[in-house]
Regions:
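A short alpha-helix-loop-beta-strand transition element characteristic
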Residues: 2-13, 48, 199-207
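Rossmann-like dinucleotide-binding cores of NAD(P)H-dependent redox enzymes
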Residues: 14-18, 33-91
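FAD-site-proximal beta/loop scaffold in flavoenzymes
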Residues: 1-7, 100, 113-184, 191
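FAD-binding core/adjacent interface of flavoenzyme oxidoreductases
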Residues: 1-21, 37, 104-110, 121
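N-terminal Rossmann-fold NAD(P) dinucleotide-binding loop
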Residues: 27-28
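A conserved short coil-to-beta-strand element within the FAD-binding core of flavoproteins
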Residues: 89-100
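C-terminal, flexible cofactor-proximal segment of oxidoreductases
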Residues: 181, 190-279
Length: 279
C-alpha cells in the first residue's frame, strides 16, 4: 500500500526491493514464496508494474542449496532466476541501516556495492541462545557436545538435541539443522529417558537419512528420495504429500489438503487495510 501511493521514485524502489540473505532451505523457499506472492498481488495495485518489484537472494557460498546434488542446485538456481529472482553467490552483507544494504564480493574484497531496500530477511545462520553460551557444558562451534546417546558427557540423564547439539568431535560427525533430524533426536531421547527410568539399556543414535526436498516457487521444487533425483511439479507434489503425513491428526490433514487445493485454483488472497488518505 505504501509503495502504491509513493511519489518519490527512490523511496518506491526501496519499498519494492526485498533481499534474502542465505540460500539454504529457508532462504530459497522464502525468496520463492515472497516473489510469487508479490507478482500475484501486483494486479491489485495499478501504480506498480511487474518490473518494479525485485527479490534478491544473497549467498556467501559458491552455490545455492549446497546440501543438494549439484544438478539439483543448478536447476533450482535457473528456475529462480527465470522467475525473476536475482541471485548473488560469493557475496556477503557487511551492513544494513534500514535503507541501504552494503554487500561485498568474497572473490574481490575491493568490490563493494549497495542495494537500496527497506527489507532485509536473514536466513544465513543462527547463533546459539545465551543460556547455552553461558552454560557449564562443553561447546563446539556454539553447540553442546553430546555422546552417542545424545547425552551430555559428565552429565548423565541430561540430553541436548536439535540445532543446539553436536556429536562428540572425535566422531567427526555433525548434525544437519533440519526438522527431520530434530524429530529423530526427539524420538530417541524420549525412548532413552524411558529406558533410564526402567533401568534398561539405552539406545545409540543412528541417523537414517530419508531424503530431502525444497520448494523453489509455486508448483516447482527439487527432491532427493530413494536414490531418485526429482525436479519440477512432481518434486513439489512429493514435498506437499510428505508434509501432509506430518500433520498430527486426520482432521488437520484434511484442513491443510483442502486449503492447498483451494490455493491451486484461486487467486492469491490478500488483506487490504483500506486506509483513508488526507485530501
Amino acid at each position: 500500500e505504501q509503495a502504491e501511493n509513493e511519489k518519490n521514485v527512490k523511496i518506491k524502489q526501496r519499498l519494492l526491493t526485498f533481499v534474502v540473505v542465505g540460500a539454504g532451505f529457508a532462504g530459497v523457499e522464502t525468496a520463492g514464496e515472497i516473489n510469487d506472492f508479490l507478482h500475484e498481488a501486483i494486479s491489485y495495485y495499478h501504480n506498480i508494474k511487474r518490473d518494479d518489484v525485485q527479490v534478491t537472494l544473497i549467498e556467501a557460498g559458491t552455490t545455492i542449496l549446497p546440501g543438494f546434488n549439484k544438478n539439483l542446485s543448478k536447476y533450482a538456481h535457473t528456475r529462480l532466476e527465470k522467475n525473476g529472482i536475482k541471485i548473488l553467490v560469493q557475496n556477503v552483507v557487511t551492513s544494513f541501516d534500514g535503507k541501504n544494504i552494503d554487500i561485498k564480493k568474497l572473490s574481490d574484497s575491493s568490490s563493494e556495492s549497495i542495494i537500496d531496500s527497506h527489507t532485509l530477511i536473514w536466513t544465513a545462520g543462527v547463533t546459539p541462545v545465551e543460556i547455552i553460551q553461558n552454560s557449564a557444558f562443553k561447546l563446539k562451534n556454539g553447540k553442546i557436545i553430546v555422546n552417542e546417546f545424545l547425552e551430555i558427557p559428565n552429565y548423565p540423564g541430561i540430553f541436548a538435541i536439535g540445532d543446539c547439539s553436536q556429536l562428540d568431535s572425535e566422531t567427526n560427525n555433525k548434525f544437519p539443522p533440519t526438522a527431520q533430524l530434530a524429530e529423530a533426536h526427539a524420538k530417541l531421547t524420549a525412548y532413552n529417558i524411558k529406558q533410564i527410568i526402567e533401568n534398561k539399556e539405552k539406545k545409540k543414535f543412528e541417523y537414517r537419512w530419508k531424503g530431502q526436498s525444497a520448494v523453489i516457487g509455486k508448483r516447482y521444487g527439487i527432491a532427493e528420495a530413494m536414490g531418485m533425483k526429482i525436479t519440477g511439479f512432481w518434486a513439489w507434489l512429493l514435498w506437499r504429500n510428505y508434509y501432509l503425513t506430518k500433520m498430527p491428526n486426520i482432521e488437520k490433514r484434511i484442513r491443510v489438503w483442502l486449503d492447498w487445493n483451494i490455493d491451486l485454483f484461486s487467486r492469491i488472497d490478500i488483506s487490504r487495510y483500506g486506509f483513508k488518505r488526507d485530501t
